[in-house]
């Protein structure tokens, strides 16, 4: 199996970072820079990343189909957390249609059947609007349907676009670069906020986020992702400074908005985390909320200027 140089570099970087992190924690502890609470939190998060990192990286490295299936599983699990937090799971038929829509989106991506992939958005929304009538309960109809449509768009359509990248010959390094950059975008925002953050970005929605943190993340993530895209998209129409900067800006902005949207939902529900699956992080949706809008935004930008999977076989399963 041939691996793109960007893939090799990113995987190596992840392994090194996980290996060096304990030494960094020990050094900070010895210097008295860590409180007992912060020290315990850092070690908890590090242990969680020892499990999360392979779960994220291995499907992307194994190839096209494992990557798409992996994203589909993530979408279903995130939807499950959302449904339980919002109470949508109590409406069994609507919840089942949303789950089926996510599975069909995943199948369309795996089949590289783009017309079906696009059609599923309107088809699933239409089915949700109609199927909710069978409960014969007008009270709460708008809320039930809106939650179902919202959930499908977030976890079916948005994650589906990210998974569809795997159909491109550069899908592997591209998806891995997106994952690494979006996770570091959160780190950059946190560090920049500590250094330069004075004015709150959205105090009612996310009290810890600052304008300085958001701008710092924007600059640093744009530089990082633009550099990664230079090596990933070399020889394509997108390997130009204007496009590389635009890709970085899009990723950082959409990543931060994904986080803010989920924070707003949690504030509305009166909860801190969507779940407690991952120690130190909350649930899967708490960890991957920044990914929500990145997929569609980058997919259509890259698709417009370069195309996605145009040189790869389409309708792999249904076209036989």
Predicted features along the sequence, with ranges:
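C-terminal membrane module of polytopic membrane proteins
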Residues: 20, 268-320
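Short amphipathic alpha-helical coupling elements at transmembrane boundaries
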Residues: 84-88, 144-148, 197, 263-270, ...
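Membrane-embedded alpha-helical bundles of polytopic integral membrane proteins
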Residues: 1-250
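Alpha-helical transmembrane segments that form the membrane-embedded catalytic/substrate-binding core
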Residues: 189-190, 209-221, 251, 255-258, ...
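Short amphipathic alpha-helical interaction segments
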Residues: 237-257, 269-270, 276-280
């Amino acid at each position: 199996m041939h691996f793109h140089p960007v893939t090799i570099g990113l995987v190596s970087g992840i392994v090194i970072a996980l290996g060096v992190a304990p030494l960094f924690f020990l050094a900070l502890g010895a210097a008295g820079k860590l409180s007992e609470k912060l020290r315990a939190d850092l070690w908890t998060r590090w242990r969680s990343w020892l499990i999360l990192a392979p779960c994220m990286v291995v499907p992307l490295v194994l190839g096209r189909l494992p990557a798409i299936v992996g994203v589909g599983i993530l979408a279903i699990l995130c939807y499950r957390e959302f449904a339980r937090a919002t109470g949508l799971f109590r409406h069994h038929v609507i919840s089942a249609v949303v789950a089926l829509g996510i599975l069909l989106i995943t199948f369309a991506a795996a089949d590289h059947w783009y017309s079906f992939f696009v059609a599923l958005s309107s088809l699933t929304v239409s089915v949700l609007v109609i199927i909710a009538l069978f409960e014969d309960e007008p009270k709460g109809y708008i809320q039930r349907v809106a939650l179902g449509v919202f959930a499908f768009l977030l976890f079916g359509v948005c994650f589906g676009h990210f998974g569809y990248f795997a159909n491109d010959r550069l899908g592997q390094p591209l998806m891995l670069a997106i994952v690494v950059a979006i996770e570091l975008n959160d780190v950059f925002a946190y560090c920049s906020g500590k250094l330069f953050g004075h004015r709150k970005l959205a105090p009612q929605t996310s009290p810890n986020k600052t304008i300085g943190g958001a701008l710092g993340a924007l600059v640093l993530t744009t530089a990082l992702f633009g550099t990664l895209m230079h090596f990933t998209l070399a020889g394509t129409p997108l390997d130009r400074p204007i496009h590389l900067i635009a890709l970085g800006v899009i990723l950082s902005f959409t990543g931060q908005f994904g986080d803010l949207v989920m924070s707003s939902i949690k504030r509305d529900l009166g909860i801190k985390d969507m779940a407690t699956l991952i120690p130190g992080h909350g649930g899967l949706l708490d960890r991957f909320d920044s990914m929500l809008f990145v997929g569609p935004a980058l997919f259509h930008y890259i698709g417009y200027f370069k195309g996605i999977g145009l040189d790869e076989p389409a309708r792999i399963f249904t076209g036989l």
